[in-house]
Amino acid sequence: MVRSSHRFRSSSKEVIAGPVTWTPFLVWDGRVNESSVDIAATAPVRKHVPMTSSFALAGANVLVAGATGGLGSRFVGQLVAAGAHVTAVGRDHGRLEALDLPAGQTLALDLRLPNACVAAVDAAAGRGPLDLVVNATGVVAFGTVADVTIDTMEELFLTNVFVPIMLSQSALPHMAPGSAIVNISGVIAEQNLPGMATYGASKAALRSFQEGFAREARRQKVRVLDTRPPHTETGLASRAIQGTAPNFAQGLDPDTVVSIILQAVTDGAKDLGSAAFASDR
């Protein structure tokens, strides 16, 4: 077990702040500390718009996690422009307000809390079955394996692996046949690099999870789409939780990356590797 400053609780304890002893095999109880979230008490129930290979985003009920980030905010913008009904989840109150969504469509929540993914899904599913879930959460770290701390490793896997798994687990019962769940593992999941080994391992773990989960979810006719765009100019590299980014070549335009991913969603794609973004470098 390792020491962590994150918030967790077992099935018999309240959420607590500050250093706690944590093990990855903690029981996730799925409950919510009501003081930590602000969800609209009522929401109009909408008719499900089934996803097909010719699915239109207009009218879709969509949950975007990590909505205040470089990619997440652009997902929200493009989805709203396409006529989707978006519930945006993020940790930054100010950036959520800047998305300029109607009341009840934003939720300030830290999805690293084991019960938070349930709250996020419940908020969006209150309007009807989910057509699309986009997970744009993620953190990055740089440094050799010898230098990366245990706390950094824990944060990488908590945010980049545990959150997508918990969000997928929470969302699946609320998704009707034909819907889709999108995660972003990135090109690093295809080939790891020195100085990014632990970060790359977390993203490879996410990709591996999706390979298995996709086969389970398709029994319910829910599509799981792994996307692996190359380096994109979102500013994430400058906000590393440890280390300093190397001198990357100019990355992809984030609006273009989001557009390609959403096109893949509407086209019924089941995988979106780095090669799909190559022409947009």
Question: What label would you give each PLM region?
Answer:
Residues 219, 226-227, 242-281:
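C-terminal helical subdomain
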Residues 144-145, 152-154:
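Substrate-binding pocket helix/loop in short-chain dehydrogenase/reductase
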Residues 68-69:
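Conserved glycine-rich cofactor-binding loop
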Residues 146, 193-197:
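Active-site loop immediately N-terminal to the catalytic Tyr-X3-Lys motif
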Residues 168, 202:
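Active-site helix of classical SDR
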Residues 136-141:
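Conserved NAD(P)H cofactor-binding loop of Rossmann-fold oxidoreductase domains
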Residues 186:
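Residue(s) in the substrate-gating loop at a strand-loop-helix junction
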